[in-house]
Amino acid sequence: MKDFGKNNKDSGYAIFLPAISNFYVRKISQHYAGTTDMFPPERIPQGFEHGLDGLNIFDKEKGYVYYSHGLYSAGHANLDLEGSKIDDGMVVNRNREHTILVGDSGGYQIGSGAWKLDWTNFEDGADWKKVRHDILKWLEEYCDYSMTLDIPLWAWLPQYRGRTGLKDPEDCLKKTIFNHEYFINNRTPGKTKFLNTLHGSNWQTSEMWYEGVKHFNDKSVYGDRAFEGYAMAGDHAGDAELLLRRLIRLRDDGLLGQADQDDVWIHTLGISVLPWGAMLTAVQRQLREHVNPNITISFDAASPYITASKGLAYDYPDLNGN
């Protein structure tokens, strides 16, 4: 077994999170539940002594490759808590002493209109009430860190507006604030640590969003119900200047760790190119030295699963002199 996550906590590097494919999770979970006949023993190649059990990256005993951290979206999960133990068993039944799961809230599925919801009755519609409740409870039950239920800033753009009816960035922010208030008022403190999702396509929209939601992380306002970390979305992932300016504002506002808060997780969504991995590591080290020693930065990508779905594989580079 190769342990690729053994130094995640102590190395000082920003932590890479594989965004785990729902299709992959479902097939491994069906194997555990005995609900599929897609993988008879004769289909398992020689050398795979643990069969499909070995394909579970969270299984430290049987996994051919073990990795301690991952990201999985509520937008792909079975939100029925008991049903999820079967359909998403690979991730939700993991050994939580040795693994960390960051949960995405499903904002992409909502903002893109993939989930059919009644946008004309956003606050009081039965479908919206159920979605908010089910996502909150799933994240609390199965994730160590969880993103808040945002309505992404891009959801008002023309290609999505016909499905969502959103008029402008302010409309996205207003609805996000409503969802945040629901999470604050209905969460069970201690079950998961929530990451306040920060959007922005430029400094102007980033500031608008930040000013609208920053108080949700303020313990002097919400006590132990306050959100504990941040998810950097929109152009914060990809625009280094925008990200750094946002972190400086968070520092100056005293929101990178308050009072007894000994764990501040900052996730940068959907970026994993090597230069950004190096940059985020440098940023984490500086924040730990000068602001709060308990800050952790992570970043994610679905590349391992997308690559495999296209019949491709990673290999080590040839570094000889020729």
What is each stretch, according to the model?
Residues P189-N322:
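Glycine-rich phosphate/ribose-binding loops and adjacent secondary-structure elements
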Residues H180, I184-R187, N217:
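Short, well-ordered alpha-helical segments in soluble proteins
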Residues M1-F183:
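Non-catalytic, usually N-terminal nucleic-acid engagement modules in DNA/RNA processing proteins
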